[in-house]
Regions:
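Sec-dependent signal peptide recognition
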Residues: 1-10
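Catalytic cores of peptidoglycan-degrading enzymes
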Residues: 128-266
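Non-catalytic extracellular/periplasmic "stalk"
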Residues: 19-134, 138
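Hydrophobic h-region of N-terminal signal peptides that target proteins for export
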Residues: 10-18
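Residue-identity detector for threonine
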Residues: 2, 26, 35, 63, ...
Length: 266
């Protein structure tokens, strides 16, 4: 009997050690992992003589284990609240066959752009706010449109008056522009190594695909194109193809704080 108790205690301790050593983070967050095994095409930084891999965590509906860049990460669920909006133009909600075909084709275009991977640009993570306005809907909220559940809101909405300037929050190359069914006038920027951002519902775009944009450079103006309830900027950020929370990138000393909160692969 004593041996059985001893075995049970050992199993509990071993399980605790496994959990303690587990790499973890919150849904939609960005984490830094200290490791000696950094591949050439991974987004990483050298700091204080150590290598840090930067990972974007996906939105999850429940706490779950995800494989990201050859690393097992426990992504913890977070309740971001909910958002309920009413769209009076029902043709933007229940699509006819023509509009659905268009929206699906545009989704493929955007998905292809997100696969972009430019290792000639090294992102600084020193993000600036792309527009002066008021946050009207935060990342991660469960979305209801006309009281029907839809996909969660994986972006940051910033309300502003029509025509307010939208500028690049970080240096990047324009990889896609277009007027799309859902997102209206849209610009997508590649900041390098899988860090990508998009700007939707613009009134106008003044950049062309292929152009390198500097931080703070004007790229467009706030509008209400596409499926919207009013003028605002819909700002989406991707890291390793996952939609992350843009708001956290605006914090002071973001990268330095990542290093200080880093986790080790043992």
């Amino acid at each position: 009997m004593i041996n059985k108790y001893a075995l049970l205690i050992n199993l509990v301790v071993f399980s605790y050690q496994l959990n303690a050593n587990e790499i973890s983070g919150t849904s939609g967050d960005v984490i830094a992992v200290k490791t000696d095994d950094v591949k050439e095409d991974y987004l990483s930084y050298r700091h204080d003589q150590s290598e840090y891999l930067i990972l974007g965590l996906p939105y999850v509906y429940e706490t779950s284990l995800k494989r990201i860049k050859d690393i097992d990460v426990e992504v913890q669920y977070k309740n971001f609240g909910e958002s309920r909006i009413t769209i009076k133009d029902l043709s933007k909600v229940d699509l006819n066959q023509k509009d659905r075909k268009r929206a699906n084709a545009e989704a493929l275009l955007i998905r292809a752009a997100i696969q972009s991977y430019d290792n000639t640009i090294s992102p600084s993570f020193n993000f600036k706010n792309p527009v002066i306005g008021i946050i009207s809907s935060r990342y991660g909220k469960k979305r209801y449109i006309n009281e029907k559940p839809r996909s969660p809101h994986l972006a940051l909405d910033i309300a502003a008056n029509l025509g307010v300037e939208v500028s690049a929050p970080l240096k990047g190359r324009v990889i896609l522009t277009g007027n799309f069914f859902y997102t209206g006038n849209t610009i997508i920027l590649d900041h390098g190594f899988g860090l990508i951002s998009s700007y939707s519902h613009l009134d106008s775009s003044i950049v062309e695909e292929g152009k390198m944009i500097q931080q703070g450079e004007l790229i467009g103006r706030v509008g209400e194109t596409g499926r919207v309830t009013g003028p605002h900027l819909h700002w989406t950020v991707y890291l390793n193809k996952e939609k992350i929370n843009p708001e956290i990138l605006l914090k002071d000393n973001f990268l330095q704080n990542l290093f200080e909160a880093s986790q080790d692969i043992l």
